[in-house]
Amino acid sequence: RDAFTEKVIDRARAAKVGFDKTVDITTGPVIDARAWTRLKGLVDDAVSEGATLLAGGDRPAGLNAGHYLAPTVLTDVTETMAVYREETFGPIVSIVPFDTKTELLRMANDCEEGGLTAYIFTRNLARAEHYAASLRYGEIQINGVKYDINLPHGGIGQSGIGHDCSALALHDYLVQKRITRALDTTTFGGLNP
């Protein structure tokens, strides 16, 4: 394994999973039992199809109640696996190598349902801006994770249907109407009423 993969594994294993405002929690529960079962199924199916589980993949030790999934790291993930093709909406990282930036962008845009958020981490901001412009996601975050009620939030395709947060979210509820008025009211467009 390369140094990047080792760092991701270390970060996943060091995550503090739970739900307690008095402790420094880094990973909370997934939304409900159905989501947990779906995520567990994605991991189990990937492993049965040849992916390698390097961290997580099940409930964290000591958290038998609730909908917690330990931060999960998979390698040897192929493009035919559901964990590759679908947005997980859970603490699962699939490490998939690439050879060219064209291949990287093709793979990143290869989600069946559309795209809610993509994250880019790099020291090369010109590269980040290039990739951001080429990604088909409703939200691109560069070198960080930022969620703010004043920033628009929403996806593309079937992901994050509609938009919320910020004044732009109101556009989903508005209907445009055009009214044109002639400035010359003496002839009324030749109708002479």
Spell out what each predicted region is:
Residues 13-16, 48, 59-61, 68-193:
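Conserved C-terminal structural/oligomerization subdomain of aldehyde/semialdehyde dehydrogenase
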Residues 16-22:
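Active-site region of PLP-dependent enzymes
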Residues 22-23, 52-63, 76:
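Conserved small-domain helix->loop->beta segment predominantly found in fold-type I
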